[in-house]
């Protein structure tokens, strides 16, 4: 895999780079951060070693937070307005808030919904695995390539991908809302927090920003799964 395609894989996790400015993120670094020697994943992810990392990536690439709404996004795109109304009729108030969120964002996300939220994070873990010396660069690139294939299938540009990620992040943040009023407010304001604003500004705010300068294209070569990852070769 040439350097240009490696950089496309690294771009999957660019939003997560920006969350940790003090670690000296680098878009072209296999290990993501150049200012630290290790990134602690135990407290936030429950990941303590190589096996934990690989299993998390394997499981959450297709069964992460985005899966909560995946069926609704797919149904919205494949149903008539009447069928959609019938589907959501009679649900709980909290369930209705989520279906309204899906209906309001489905055109922006496409059938993939907010899967980009999980793809960004799995790309992040793949690169941090190199930083923490749990993965070789070859292993990391293969894992990222499996995520990239999915992202390229569901989204049509880096801006599309980032939009879906941002809405996924909003959904994840809303899970902390304890009552329906605050949940509805969180899912209808579409307001960036300071970190979200920084990500948007650096990645997507103009034609000269990082995501706007990258090609959105399929990989020319799909590398073979390393023997050391044979247990997850069906990713």
Curated annotation (Swiss-Prot):
Domain of life: Bacteria
InterPro entries per UniProt: DUF1266
Similarity-based family: To E.coli YbeR.
Full protein name: Uncharacterized protein YbeU
Annotated organism of origin: Escherichia coli (strain K12)
Record gene name: ybeU
């Amino acid at each position: 895999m040439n350097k240009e395609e490696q950089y496309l894989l690294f771009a999957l996790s660019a939003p997560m780079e920006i969350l940790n400015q003090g670690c000296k993120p680098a878009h072209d670094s296999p290990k993501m951060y150049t200012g630290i020697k290790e990134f602690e994943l135990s407290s936030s992810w429950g990941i303590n070693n190589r096996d934990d990392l690989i299993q998390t990536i394997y499981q959450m690439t297709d069964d992460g937070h985005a899966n909560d709404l995946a069926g609704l996004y797919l149904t919205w795109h494949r149903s008539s307005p009447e069928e959609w109304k019938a589907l959501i009729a009679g649900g709980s108030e909290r369930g209705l808030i989520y279906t309204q969120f899906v209906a309001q964002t489905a055109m922006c996300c496409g059938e993939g919904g907010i899967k980009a939220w999980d793809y960004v994070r799995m790309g992040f873990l793949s690169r941090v695995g190199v930083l923490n010396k749990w993965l070789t660069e070859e292993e990391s690139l293969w894992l990222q390539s499996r995520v990239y294939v999915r992202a390229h299938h569901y989204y049509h540009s880096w801006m599309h991908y980032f939009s879906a990620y941002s809405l996924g992040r909003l959904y994840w943040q809303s899970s902390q809302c304890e009552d329906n009023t605050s949940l509805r407010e969180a899912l209808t304001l579409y307001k960036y927090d300071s970190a979200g604003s920084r990500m948007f500004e650096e990645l997507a705010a103009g034609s000269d920003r990082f995501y706007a300068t990258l090609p959105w294209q399929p990989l020319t070569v799909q590398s073979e799964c390393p023997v050391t990852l044979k247990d997850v070769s069906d990713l």
